[in-house]
Each structure stands twice: as structure tokens, then as C-alpha cells.
Amino acid sequence: MSAPREDADVETSSEGYARRFAGPVGRFFLERQAEATLALLRPFPGASVLDVGGGHGQVTGPLVDAGHDVTVLGSDASCEARVREWTGPGRARFVSSDLLAPSLPGRSFDVALSYRLLPHVSRWPDLVAALCRLARRAVVVDYPTRRSVNAVADLFFGLKKGVEGNTRPFTVFSDAEVEEAFAAHGFAPTGRRPQFFFPMALHRGLGSAGLARGLEGAASALGLTRALGSPVILRLERRG
């Protein structure tokens, strides 16, 4: 019996999911994510980027505006809805295919990127393999790390769901297991950007972008975010 098709991006491409990032606090989250992403892509100006599971559209605009050639891959045609602002006028492209076995040639993009997906895919090593197959130069992914409050994620899941409403269970990774999975395909880490020291659910619950900026600014200045921040955005480059 074949494994069920992975479609976690259908949820992250929905309007309901987008509402989690609405308002000033949500915009702060997305700004921080975009800044980290563009910094990690700085060695690859004008790169062709495949955003696997990127129907959430969180980085489509920043990538396009920075001059990258963007293709969004979704598991279903419905995942295009939130990126049609860019795909409609031809500023980006959308393709629908199996997330774990995309019908695209190997090494056909400079960079394969995937956010909001790795922790929600049951066969995540297969996603890693797919990203590595498609990337000519680098892969960029995000993941919740155990080097943070996520180490006790199960204990706080009920509280998190109470604040966020539509949160889902997710896999928390050690940095080593993510790096080892990519190493098996010839990729090594070359850039790491932990995003938040304090839980995102806490910032949502407090509801103040100004306070969130202040707290995270202080944590960054003290080196806490670098040591214990999550989710981590990781860049890995092909070796050999």
C-alpha cells in the first residue's frame, strides 16, 4: 500500500493560515523572516528559486522584488490562490506537483527553498531528498529547533492552540539531525539565522508589535537569539 500524498501546504496556503500573520505582530514576523531570507540569498543574486510548499506567499514578494526568478510549487492547484498576485501578471510561476517527488528536472533551480513545511511532513527525509535533487547550488529551509522553548513543545501545545486557534502539531528537530539529513545528499550548512528567542505564541498573545520588537531586540543584543532562537532558517550549499 502506497503512502498517502503529502499535502501539508494546502493548510499553509489557506486564508485561515494567513490570518495568523495579519496585523502588526504578524507583519513583524514576516518582516524578520524576509530579512533573514534575503540575507542568506545574498551570495546568489538573481537566482532561480523554487519555493516548495510556498503557496502561503510569505516570501514570494520579497524574493521577486529582490530580483530573483521565483517558481512556487504546491501539492494542489488551490495552493496558487495566495500567490496569484505575482503569478497572474507573470512576475512568478506556479506549478502543481507531488511535494516529495516533484516532476521537475534535477538541479533545475539555483536554490530550493521551503518554509512552514518540514515540521509538518511525516516523511520529512523524503522532502530533504527532493529539495537536494532540485537545487543546483543551495537549499534554504526553516525548522523549529530543540535548542529553544520548543524542546517542551508538547507541554505547551494546548496553550499555543488557545492563543493561535488553528495551530497544528509539528515535529521539533535537533540541529544535528537536520544537518545530517542534508549531508547524506552532499549539502553542508553555510548560514544559520534563528528568528525569535521568545515563543511566537507569546508575542501573538501580548498583541504588541512594539513590545515584540523590543523584547527580540534585547534578546538579540544579549546573544540569546543566536544561541536559543527558533525557528531556524538554515542555508546549506552543495559540496562537490
Regions inferred by a protein language model and the residue ranges of each:
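A short glycine-rich, Lys/Arg-flanked "PGG" loop and its adjoining helix->strand segment in the class I
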Residues: 125-138
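Acceptor-substrate binding/catalytic loop of class I
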Residues: 160-177
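A conserved beta-strand element that flanks and buttresses the S-adenosyl-L-methionine
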Residues: 113
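Conserved class I S-adenosyl-L-methionine
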Residues: 1-44, 46-55, 140-162
